[in-house]
Amino acid sequence: MEYKKIEINYQLCQLEELSEVEQMVVKKSIEATNTAYAKYSHFYVGAAALLNNGIVVMGSNQENAAFPSSLCAERTAVFAAQATYPNEPIKVLAIAAKTDKGILKDPITPCGACRQVLLEVEGRYSQPIKILLYGQNGIYCLTSVKDLLPFSFVESNMQD
C-alpha cells in the first residue's frame, strides 16, 4: 500500500490587504447576505462574482421547505452571471455568511455541489476563478477552484 498526500495552499488575508476591486467584491458578498431567503436555517449566505468585463453579479441562498429544492448563494450568483453574460468568464468570487447574530467570525467554504459547479465554470472559460471566503477574523484567498476540490470530476474523466 502506498500513502500519498495532497496539500491545499491558500492565504489568510485581511480586507485591507486585498486590491480595491477585490475589497469591493467582498463587500458586495456581504451586502448579498441581506437578500438571502433563509426562513428555515437562519443562515444567510451572499456571493458576488466579478466578471472579466468588470460587472459584479450577486447571489444569495434561497431556501425551500423541500430542502433539495433550495439554491446556495454561489450557484445563484454563478448561474445568474452565466445566463446574463454567457461569454464573460468569472474572475473573482467572494462569499460571506451571517446568522441572526451577524457576520460569521470565520469564513465558510462552498458545499460540494457548488464546488463542482464552480470547477465546471472555471474549465468552461479555461481561466482560474480567484476565491475569497470572508470572515471577520480573516479572508481565505485561493487562486483557483481546484484548490477547493483536489479530487475533481471533469469532462476528461468521461472519456476513454
Name these PLM-found stretches:
Residues 44-51:
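Short beta-strand scaffold segments in enzyme catalytic cores
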Residues 58-158:
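Zn2+-dependent cytidine deaminase-like catalytic core
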